[in-house]
């Protein structure tokens, strides 16, 4: 029987999942499942169990379950620490490694968790646009601002000059708050609420721009300036030669990325936009499994 890795990219709205082999090849198309993130603990665990069984091909045996999970999360011990973020509150304090082991029948050591931005970085360094990078910075803009740093194809070690603790800078001071409050979906919605009178996400803003709304265009430009300002200290501290940007908002990159493009040009940094972050994230999970 074929050995497979069951890989899940866990989001607050949906969970993307697929079986992969040890070389990072997809053995079936990526499937989308409702996250049910506001449900009770038992319902959530049953939902994960259903996903595990649904994506495992016939005549295949799962040898590992790998999950890209948003933080805060105790990745080493498999304990969910999400609380007060309107997603998976019922799993707070739950040992998901033990729970998923009981659900799947796999040994606990075969259930692995990794930060979603780190998985994205591993996928890009092994399969994507950063395979030749010497020093690479990875930023995924979604419900928050995820980040990771790479050196010569590997995650930067703790203590590497220019790399913040754990590779995270979502909580770095920025303007009157922190990076995460500005460079995120909620940051864009807050900005559009201030400028347009109604909170809009990236897709809704892009639709308004396509309809000729100049105020929506100005809002995206302002977001792009904030993004550049937030990343500049990290770029100057780490001195990457490659910057990979991910997240669903990258579908609208042409509407807001100009300030960052200009900064990268001035600093001779190669800038890449990843159109399907989940694909790279799931491939990155197989790299994490093989480490």
Residue spans for each PLM region:
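Conserved phosphate-binding loops in N-terminal lobes of ATP-dependent enzymes
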Residues: 2-71, 76
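Active-site glycine-centered loops adjacent to acidic/histidine catalytic or metal-binding residues
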Residues: 9, 116, 142
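Short glycine-rich anion-binding loops that position phosphate/pyrophosphate groups of nucleotides
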Residues: 13, 70-73, 142-146, 249
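Glycine/GP-enriched mid-protein hinge/lid loop-to-helix segment characteristic of carbohydrate kinases
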Residues: 18-20, 29-31, 40-41, 91, ...
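Adenine-nucleotide phosphate-binding core of ATP-dependent small-molecule kinases
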Residues: 31, 36-57, 61-63, 177-181, ...
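Glycine-rich phosphate-binding loop and adjoining helix at the ATP-binding site
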Residues: 34-37, 41-49, 61-65, 71-135, ...
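Short, hydrophobic alpha-helical segments
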Residues: 52, 56, 286-291
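Conserved phosphate-binding/catalytic loops in two-lobed NTP-binding clefts
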Residues: 107-111, 257-286
